[in-house]
């Protein structure tokens, strides 16, 4: 399982969401609305002698903070478990990421803020577990 292939696969899945800018590498200054695919943390050899590895990573979804209400409403549509704007549904639309892994699962989404330079965004941090 190569990190670059996993990131590229996640980017392709997330690009199915209309209007979403997707970064497979952490940008200096993102343009919202955006999904940023983070770096992978690996656990090797879960199943004897190179049989299975596990990677965990975050995808941060952020929106511009125009006002609290409008920013939160924009962000909430991405949190839905299904539908055209669902981050979870988009990520899990191809569980093998075009062969980059065996399977994956979105395990959680945590609300927060994301800062880049002088700009603060509203965000959700999606935790993903990938096996391969």
Across the structure, where does each feature detected by a protein language model lie?
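Charged, amphipathic alpha-helical segments and their flanking helix caps
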Residues: 1-31, 41-132
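Two-metal-ion RNase H-like nuclease active-site motif
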Residues: 37
